[in-house]
């Protein structure tokens, strides 16, 4: 069994939980996911099965799209709605929506983020959330990410001394939307957190086409495997090249070939089928991963 699954992850489930359950449903151990989702986040979780597990790193490289809600008025340990409140700054007057939108615009393009303590980023061989649960604070390395689009998608609503609005973000891999929410709050002068989040697109897969675990289990029971997408969709943003029969033969034998290309990595096709991922070495391309 080989292919890519567009899984609709539910709230309360880790990405690892989803993989574990799919292994049981599909009866295979060779399964991985293309981009972690926090337990409280719902939406698209790309799943690679069989040969497609070799595509995971490229699936992760493609941009992701999220829709969610930001709450101004208090912040939490985890930077989302599940965490303990650590700071409060009551919203006592109506916010200027123009200033809010200007602050949002200032967080687009290449930006620097510091990963939250409650995250799976590793420092000195340990995940940050392990330090956090032990009550330890460690220095976290900055990381460069890109926010391609960040926009407010609703009027600002008010609930007591809190203000809320929904948003849409298109971003690069490694972006923490929780941290983006907190950083926006700081620019506006308020403690803030991400109060809801849905991933609507990842690895070229869309939420409206995603299937829940129960739906996949029903299809497997009925002998229907139409939920498995071909490996080709996992090539993400890689430039695609179509090889001649002679070039394809050379690639199958692991030999270098000459191509009129400049990109560091290429997705090489034979007819309509993904044959290999090629890596530039000097003026030639070497097969990095061969699929057939």
From Swiss-Prot:
**Is Amino-acid biosynthesis one of the keywords UniProt gives this record?**
no
Q: Which SUPFAM superfamilies match?
A: Pseudouridine synthase
Q: Which family does it belong to?
A: Belongs to the pseudouridine synthase TruB family. Type 1 subfamily.
The superkingdom listed in its UniProt entry is Bacteria
Report the protein name in the record.
Answer: tRNA pseudouridine synthase B
Name the enzyme's class.
Answer: isomerase
Any single biological process term in GO: tRNA pseudouridine synthesis
**Which keywords appear in this protein's UniProt record, sorted alphabetically?**
Isomerase, tRNA processing
Q: Which GO terms describe its molecular function?
A: RNA binding; tRNA pseudouridine(55) synthase activity
Q: So what EC number does this one have?
A: 5.4.99.25
Q: Active-site positions, per UniProt?
A: 38 (nucleophile)
State the function annotated in the UniProt record: Responsible for synthesis of pseudouridine from uracil-55 in the psi GC loop of transfer RNAs.
**Lineage of this protein's species?**
Bacteria, Bacillati, Bacillota, Bacilli, Lactobacillales
Q: For this protein, what reaction is catalysed?
A: uridine(55) in tRNA = pseudouridine(55) in tRNA
| InterPro entries linked to this entry | PsdUridine_synth_cat_dom_sf, PsdUridine_synth_N, tRNA_psdUridine_synth_TruB, TruB_C
């Amino acid at each position: 069994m080989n292919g890519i699954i567009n899984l609709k992850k539910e709230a309360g489930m880790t990405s690892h939980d989803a993989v574990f359950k799919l292994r049981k449903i599909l009866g295979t151990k060779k399964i991985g996911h293309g981009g972690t989702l926090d337990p409280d986040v719902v939406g698209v979780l790309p799943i690679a099965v069989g040969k497609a597990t070799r595509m995971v790193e490229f699936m992760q490289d493609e941009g992701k799209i999220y829709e969610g809600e930001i709450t101004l008025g208090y912040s939490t340990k985890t930077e989302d709605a599940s965490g303990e409140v650590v700071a409060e700054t009551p919203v006592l007057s109506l916010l200027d929506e123009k200033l809010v939108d200007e602050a949002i615009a200032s967080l687009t393009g290449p930006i620097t983020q510091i990963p939250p303590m409650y995250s799976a980023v590793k420092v000195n061989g340990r995940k940050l959330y392990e330090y956090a649960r032990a009550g330890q604070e460690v220095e976290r390395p900055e990381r460069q990410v890109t926010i391609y689009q960040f926009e407010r998608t609703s009027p600002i609503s008010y609930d007591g001394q809190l203000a809320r609005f929904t948003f849409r973000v298109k971003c690069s891999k490694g972006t923490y939307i929780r941290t983006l929410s907190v950083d926006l709050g700081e620019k506006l002068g308020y403690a803030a957190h991400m109060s809801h989040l849905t991933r609507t697109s990842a690895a070229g897969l869309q939420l409206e086409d995603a299937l829940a675990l129960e739906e996949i289990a029903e299809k497997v029971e009925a002998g229907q495997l139409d939920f498995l997408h071909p490996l080709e969709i996992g090539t993400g943003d890689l430039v695609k090249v179509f090889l001649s029969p002679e070039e394809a033969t050379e690639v199958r034998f692991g030999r270098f070939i000459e191509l009129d290309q400049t990109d560091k990595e290429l997705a090489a096709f034979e007819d309509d089928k993904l044959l290999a991922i090629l890596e530039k070495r000097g003026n030639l391309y070497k097969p990095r991963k061969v699929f057939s």
